[in-house]
Amino acid sequence: MAFKDNAVELEERVVAINRVTKVVKGGRRLRFAALVVVGDRNGRVGFGTGKAQEVPEAIRKAVEAAKKNMIEVPMVGTTIPHEVRSEFGGARVLLKPAVEGAGVAAGGAVRAVVELAGVADITSKSLGSNTPINIVRATVEGLKQLKRAEEVASLRGVSVSDLA
């Protein structure tokens, strides 16, 4: 779900920069891979990766990729509507709503994604692999699974007040 309007100011955060090498006949070719998360702190977030000979160019490519890969995050006040578990590769992420004022209880890559999405109160736990790219992908996958109460009610064919 790509958003075309660039009128909204997006904040970007570099999650990881890796030095990668390719072994060729003449020796090693060095490049940099960057993982960047962008968001408007208002329910929209995306991530991207970029690779280049220089770090700034890799970051620029990653930001462009992230802007093309934005998702909408449903929120209830300052937190998420319900608990969600997701995994990508060996990384597993558990995201739980928290009471207002609790803050973001999340580590590293998960923190970057949820803060830039605009979630102010959340508890999370990363299990399994701690590879930043897989943690970010698992977190975004979890945020994609979130549904508002109205959506759940319409899927079940009941009113929102009947959900308990």
From Swiss-Prot:
Presence of the UniProt keyword Ribosomal protein in the record: yes
Taxonomic superkingdom: Bacteria
Residue ranges occupied by any S5 DRBM domain in the UniProt entry: 10-73
GO CC annotations on file: small ribosomal subunit
GO annotation terms (biological process): translation
GO molecular function terms noted in the UniProt entry: rRNA binding; structural constituent of ribosome
InterPro entries: Ribosomal_Su5_D2-typ_SF, Ribosomal_uS5, Ribosomal_uS5_bac-type, Ribosomal_uS5_C, Ribosomal_uS5_N, Ribosomal_uS5_N_CS, Ribsml_uS5_D2-typ_fold_subgr
UniProtKB keywords: Ribonucleoprotein, Ribosomal protein, RNA-binding, rRNA-binding
Pfam family, one: Ribosomal_S5
Quaternary structure (record): Part of the 30S ribosomal subunit. Contacts proteins S4 and S8.
Function text: With S4 and S12 plays an important role in translational accuracy. Located at the back of the 30S subunit body where it stabilizes the conformation of the head with respect to the body.
Domain comment as written in the entry: The N-terminal domain interacts with the head of the 30S subunit; the C-terminal domain interacts with the body and contacts protein S4. The interaction surface between S4 and S5 is involved in control of translational fidelity.
Family the UniProt entry places it in: Belongs to the universal ribosomal protein uS5 family.
Protein name from the UniProt record: Small ribosomal subunit protein uS5
